[in-house]
Amino acid sequence: MEDIAKDMHIAKKTIYKFFPSKEALLQGIVEYGFSHIQENKKNILQQDIPYLEKLKKLLIAMPADLESIDFKQLEPLQSQYPAVFHQISTHLSSDWKPVLDFIQKGIDEKIIRDIPLYMIEVIVTSSMNSLLSSSCSPASYQQSINDLADILMKGILIWNNVS
């Protein structure tokens, strides 16, 4: 809290007026971040870009102001602030309806193979959670998510549509 107050040039008391604890502050940051991710997804869906480009953007949907965060550094939250870590995991496992609806559109238009949507959701969410809980990848979280999107998309494309 001291570091945050110092960086913001305010007193710790001011922070504690809005957030009664470090955990409450972290929960607020998580909510802020994920609300921006959802807003970013809405903006992507409104863009006039090719289907596959839009799909990849949706899968990685990280707003520019959060791209520099290496989410793998959040692993200590699991032991220090389990409620915050659970909140992150819950967000990663939910909020997929717009993406799944968009994938269904691709299935309907024969751009994507007819595969169960729940399986895509399981693969993506479990991979994201695994990347958060693991330091096995030498790449940043954002790069790992980009890699995941590439692997997923190349596995779901109908090959005669690949350019």
What is each of the regions a protein language model found here?
Residues 1-24, 28:
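Helix-turn-helix
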Residues 23, 55-56, 84-89:
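Short alpha-helical transmembrane interface motifs in multi-pass membrane proteins
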Residues 4, 29-33, 37, 99:
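Generic hydrophobic, amphipathic alpha-helix propensity
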Residues 28, 39-68, 120-124:
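Hydrophobic alpha-helical connector segments
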Residues 63-101, 107, 133:
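Short secondary-structure transition hinges
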Residues 36, 58-69, 109, 127-134, ...:
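Phosphate/oxyanion-binding loops and surfaces in catalytic or ligand/nucleic-acid-binding neighborhoods
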Residues 41, 45, 131-136:
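Short amphipathic alpha-helical interaction patches enriched in hydrophobic/aromatic residues
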Residues 53, 57, 97, 101-105, ...:
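C-terminal peripheral helix-coil segments that are non-catalytic and often amphipathic
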